[in-house]
Amino acid sequence: MTFKKDQLTVHIFETRTQMGLAAAEDIAACMKKLLSEKDTINMCFAAAPSQNDVLESLLSMPLPWECVNAFHMDEYVGLKKEDKQSFGYYLDEHIFKKVPFKAVYYVADYGLDYAKCLEENPFDIMCLGIGENGHIAFNDPGVADFSDPLRIKLAKLDDVCRMQQVHDGCFPTFDDVPEYAYTLTVPQMVSAKYMFCVVPAATKADAVYNTLNLDVTDQCPATILRTHENAFLYCDADSAAKLPKEV
């Protein structure tokens, strides 16, 4: 099923596999379109188990990765990109070291100086997810600012966000999850020309419902997707379970 909510296009699939493949096919088509117009594109990736399906599908496709600069949207303070619980490590394992990117820019290598890399390389494609609390990157409710003047900032993670990392199997207990992270800001994220948001699993059903039904405010940061003219949301049956069966 496909429908529009404000400017956001929503696709719902029965399975995660179908969802991931469809998102990957759309991302691949977008990459090829952009590379027909210029020599290099800039892509930003999310690091979370919710992205496994789409990344796996992208890896199965013959794409011109050598024309792509890769970025990611957040990183825990105090972790190096080689640390197994870092987002840099996740992305190395799932895409960054699997294909020949032109360049890969890690948040852990720059900290807040990542802003200069972002300024010099405007995003063409943003591949993201939505957190259980409606966050995008680590822009949690209370941290997100739709008018943020910064490109990247230091964020204190809320309890729901930290508990999600346990639910995702990234950390054994709540207390093991770092309290602080670097995150791209909301304006930096929505500056991308195209946004492909992949959100599977029953744990995200409330977040998907809220994204599509609450007012567009920073109390549910993902609602900002509804204001972007080239934003696409991909759900499976579980994450879409609280939506009407017909729209």
Task: Walk through the language-model features, giving the residues of each.
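Glycine-rich N-terminal segment of FAD-binding domains in flavoprotein oxidoreductases
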Residues: 32-61
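Short, flexible loop segments at the rims of nucleotide/cofactor-binding pockets, characterized by
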Residues: 106, 172-178, 211-213
